[in-house]
A protein has these predicted regions:
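Extracellular carbohydrate-recognition regions
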Residues: 124-168
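Extracellular carbohydrate recognition
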Residues: 334, 347-370
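Beta-rich interaction/scaffold domains
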Residues: 25-131
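C-terminal motif of bacterial Sec signal peptides marking the signal peptidase cleavage site
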Residues: 19-23
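Short carbohydrate-recognition loop motifs
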Residues: 183-204
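Residues within well-ordered beta-strands of beta-sheet-rich folds
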Residues: 132, 249-255, 280-282, 323-327, ...
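Extracellular carbohydrate recognition and processing domains
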Residues: 288-335, 356
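Extracellular-facing segments of soluble proteins and assemblies that are Gly/Ser/Thr-biased and enriched
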Residues: 200-289
């Protein structure tokens, strides 16, 4: 009998304890108020997301998310992958097709406790201009038909053609070597790339104009003005093409080997100097289509609106990506007229006739990324 009383007593206590827990109302359970998007990405291997150029960047403080997409691409049914705070939900749901055709879309996150937060996701359209260096041809109006340049680019080949053709007659210079900028099958992708080599053009003068001991291999967006060669060599490089877009980035692939023997402008061997390659981009404003910056003014003019540069003196044996992010020193105004230059040189100080024989820069798959700006 006493054992039965104890059993009933313990059973009663157990029931009371259980009732304490089960009697708690669900509303008394602590629920999270976190309503954040912790990750927002696009799988660009999915066909629906092919237009996406950059992964989204989350600005938590302002509840905004931004990404870039190709101007000509389809953004009417992009499929984002979204992660949110534990226990929260998001609408539209992760994996759903969402239209960004209007430029933005909103996503609402609801926390466990019902707290909500609305994010605005903006799609900034960009346009791309790409150069693959597969097509080479003699420039229209070239003085010497043997000159071959990559499509869309000017090179120092025109200057070396002058040395080859005028040197023997007017300066006692006989240069029979390769042109500095050549098509090569050593490419990052496709069949060919551009090879820029600084070559030994002997030095001396032609009709009173100095010929460098080493001519730097160079390639640029712009025009080579052969008519200026005998009066002002720095004016031969007319940098920049008319540009109706706002460039923000220049990307591509390069590899580089500096030459062993460095010579100064006087043709003197400088055993203690090391060559380096240079890659730069310059956007500048013009009053007319004929206005241009040249070798003397391209980096110093007050017309410059944006610039970026990169260089290295290290040997880079394999194709390596480079990226120039333009830094704007003036506001971009779509109603104004601009020219844009991208410049590659196997010898960074080659314009001043300081370079190493054999410095070689390979360039392939160059892309200019432009922000779409309404007028």
């Amino acid at each position: 009998m006493k054992l039965r009383k104890y059993l009933f007593f313990y059973l009663f206590v157990a029931i009371c304890i259980a009732s304490l827990f089960t009697s708690c109302d669900e509303d008394d359970v602590i629920r999270s108020s976190e309503a954040n998007i912790t990750s927002f990405t696009f799988d660009t291997t999915v066909a629906a997301n092919a237009a996406v150029l950059s992964q989204p960047v989350i600005d938590e403080a302002n509840a905004t998310i931004t990404f870039k997409a190709e101007e000509s691409g389809d953004v009417s049914a992009l499929v984002p992958t979204i992660e949110v705070s534990a226990g929260a939900t998001v609408t539209p749901a992760s994996g759903s097709a969402v239209s960004f055709a209007s430029g933005s879309a909103t996503f609402t996150v609801v926390a466990e406790d019902g707290t909500s937060k609305v994010y605005t996701v903006s799609c900034n359209m960009s346009s791309l201009i790409q150069y693959d260096f597969e097509t080479w041809a003699t420039p229209e109006g070239a003085m010497y038909p043997e000159v071959v340049n990559p499509e869309g680019w000017a090179t120092c080949n025109d200057a070396v053609a002058l040395i080859k053709n005028m040197g023997p007659m007017f300066g006692g210079i006989t240069y029979t070597g390769e042109y500095p900028v050549r098509q090569t099958t050593d490419a990052y992708s496709g069949s060919t790339a551009a090879m820029l080599e600084s070559v030994d053009t002997q030095g001396g003068s032609i009709l009173g104009q100095t010929i460098p001991k080493v001519t730097a291999g160079s390639m640029f967006l712009g025009t080579f003005n052969a008519m200026a060669a005998m009066s002002d060599p720095m004016a031969t490089t007319e940098f920049g093409i008319l540009y109706d877009k706002k460039p923000v980035k220049v990307l591509g692939y390069y590899k580089y080997t500096p030459g062993a023997e460095f010579y100064n402008a006087a043709g003197e061997l400088q055993a203690d100097r090391q060559d380096a390659c240079a890659i730069s981009a310059v956007l500048y404003e013009v009053e007319s289509e004929d206005e241009t910056l040249n070798g003397s003014t391209i980096y110093t003019s007050d017309k410059i609106v944006a610039m970026a540069s990169f260089g290295t003196g290290e040997t880079v044996a394999e194709y390596t990506p480079f990226e120039l992010n333009l830094e704007y020193v003036k506001d971009y105004d779509a109603s104004k007229t601009y020219k844009f230059a991208v410049i590659f040189s196997a010898s960074a100080d080659g314009a001043a006739y300081n370079a190493a024989v054999g410095s070689t820069l390979y360039i392939d798959d160059v892309t200019i990324e432009n922000e779409v700006v309404a007028e």
